Amino acid sequence: MSRRVCLALDLVDDADLIADYERAHAPGAVWPEVTRGIRDKGFTDMEIWRVADRLVMIAQVADDWPRDLDAEGRAVDTRWEAAMDHFQRPLSCAGDGEKWVPMRRIYSLGEQAG
């Protein structure tokens, strides 16, 4: 089984940095070991959407998400996160050390009458 999660994060509001961030996430640009690590953490699908300087991640995750990575996976994850840090700006509601903040679903068409 899997479930959908949505997370939010802001980017530094700088057009050049935003363009660089998008290039870093273009097909083939993300390090293969990062992609493997994402899957190893329990993500079965993931998309990142952007409007202005706001990012929204929509992901399907395994029921046991988030999974811990092995030492090698943690090292790669740490390097990737460090490479992305200068692009990203946590939301004001983020906790200490938190970047991607989970969002709460407030509406579902399938749950509506009619």
Regions found by a protein language model. Name each.
Residues 4, 52-56:
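A generic structural signal for beta-strand entry/edge sites
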Residues 4-10:
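Active-site-flanking beta-strand signature of metal-NTP-handling nucleotidyl enzymes
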Residues 14-15, 54-55, 62-67:
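Short, charged/polar surface micro-motifs in flexible loops or helix N-caps
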Residues 46-51:
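Short beta-strand
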Residues 41, 62-99:
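An amphipathic, aromatic/His-enriched active-site/gating alpha helix that lines ligand/cofactor pockets
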Residues 17-42:
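Short amphipathic alpha-helical segments
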Residues 94-114:
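Short, low-order "capping/linker" segments at domain edges
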